[in-house]
Amino acid sequence: MLDTLLIDATPRWLIGQAVAFLALALCIAGFANKDDNKLLLILIAANVAFAAQFALLGSWVSAGITCIVITRIVLARRYHRNLFIMAALLAATIGVTIVGWQDWKDAPASIAGILGTVGMFAFRGSIMRWWLFVAAFFWVLSNVAIGSLGGILAESLVMTTNIITIWRIEMDKRRLALQAD
């Protein structure tokens, strides 16, 4: 990544970095919000910024999959466990990967897209968040591969937030179980 920072500091690269930090700010605003509807709207805006960032940094598979992620956020909430829609989004993710494949740097975004789709459509609660945690890890790898500082920080924030939320969900389950006894 250091070689990217030193060699690729073109105006397009700098704008890509700025857009990534905008996405980071939107992620922070989204996860700080207690209203799920506002969270989803802010996450959609963050993913629009991520798609632009990936395009500016020349990662077309990541940009395409991020556009699919935007669609997934909207559909997963309304059509949870709908296997047809999940399969269509998985096929779109694989299709974008095949059409746009440039090199190994495209693999983490593809894996992240697949894991996130399965997680959001097949699960809820802690299990869904574990899937999203692993998907975020692959988004971190994708951002490392293209040298996106804001993207690395944003996805690391997503991972940290997911771990904290998983812990809180599990603690609530334990409290409820103790109260039931």
What function would you assign to each model-found segment?
Residues 2-181:
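Alpha-helical membrane-protein topology signature
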